[in-house]
Design a protein with these regions (language model features):
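A hydrophobic membrane-anchoring feature enriched in long, contiguous, low-charge segments
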Residues: 1-3
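Short acidic-capped amphipathic helix/loop micro-motif used as an active-site/signal-coupling element
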Residues: 234-235
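Catalytic donor nucleotide-activated moiety binding site of glycosyltransferases and closely related
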Residues: 250-271
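Acidic/histidine-rich catalytic neighborhood
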Residues: 207
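Charged active-site motifs of nucleotide-sugar-dependent glycosyltransferases
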Residues: 34-39, 213-220, 230-231, 245-248
Length: 271
């Protein structure tokens, strides 16, 4: 796994100055001794990270003697964290450590969180079992188990039950997830809705930004694209343009760091 992280660094999938955070434990960088409560949120990527920002703001306004550790796994989410966490005092971002027993235990010993919140479908067995062993409360918020994922979990129902029962509380984002956890006889499961829908979106700002581009024009939107799909979308644009000369194609990649690659593909096709 360590070799894999170094390989990802070589192919520019990891931050060259911070990739070791996934291998070595890190210290909190706030020196205020009075701030003795640490809340750890793990949100794997951009969507999960943005969904917890309102929660962080509420917690910070309610209790000023808190410090927050936010961990993510992707390069793109770390860039968003720089922006979002500037608005939240006493918040710190780190990359999530590899889910290897001795690494996660070192991480827990260094940071000593008072509680850990996992967001969405982030299930890391070694960290979960270690936190339980250390007596650290763990909560799964916005829990999301798809029908495909639930079938995989049911290959090992005993293991699934053991893992999910480590959580002190599971807040399901939908009834499908709640029913799945209930069928596993997981305790402390509640349906709380999708917290991603709680974010306030400035619709007017988005409309004003795009109105001149899209007004009176045909357009189509390719959302959450992956490698290999972008070229197909661009070639589709060329085909559509023959019939609809003013067509606008909008591509939103799943991982924002691929934007440069999409731009290069566009230039190669003279777009």
């Amino acid at each position: 796994l360590v070799i894999f992280i170094y390989f990802r660094k070589i192919i520019k999938k990891e931050n060259p100055s911070r990739f070791k955070e996934k291998i070595y434990p890190s210290h909190f960088n706030i020196e205020d001794k009075k701030m003795n409560k640490l809340i750890w949120f793990h949100a794997t990527s951009i969507g999960e990270l943005k969904s917890i920002v309102p929660i962080l703001k509420e917690l910070n306004s309610a209790e000023t003697k808190l410090k927050f550790l936010i961990t993510t796994t992707t390069l793109s989410s770390s860039e968003i964290a720089k922006i979002e966490l500037k608005k939240i005092p006493n918040a710190c971002h780190r990359f999530f450590p590899l889910d290897v027993n001795f690494l996660v235990q070192q991480f827990l010993k260094k940071w000593k969180p008072n509680v850990i919140f996992f967001v969405d479908s982030e299930i890391w067995p070694n960290l979960i079992f270690s936190a339980k062993k250390f007596g650290i409360p763990i909560v799964l918020i916005n829990a999301r188990i798809t029908s495909k994922t639930s079938k995989r979990w049911m290959w090992f129902p005993g293991v699934a039950k053991k893992i999910f029962n480590c959580f002190n509380l599971c807040l399901a984002s939908n009834l499908e997830t709640k029913n799945f956890l209930k069928n596993l006889n997981v305790e402390n499961v509640q349906f709380y809705g999708n917290i991603k829908l709680a974010n306030k979106i400035n619709v007017s700002a988005i409309q004003n930004q795009n109105k001149d581009i899209l007004v009176n024009k045909r357009f189509w939107f390719a959302a959450s694209t992956h490698i290999g799909e972008d070229e197909f979308c661009l070639k589709t644009h060329l085909l559509l343009k023959k019939k609809y000369p003013d067509i606008i194609s909008i591509i939103a990649p799943r991982h924002i760091e691929r934007s440069k690659d999409i731009k290069s593909l566009s230039e190669n096709l003279n777009l």
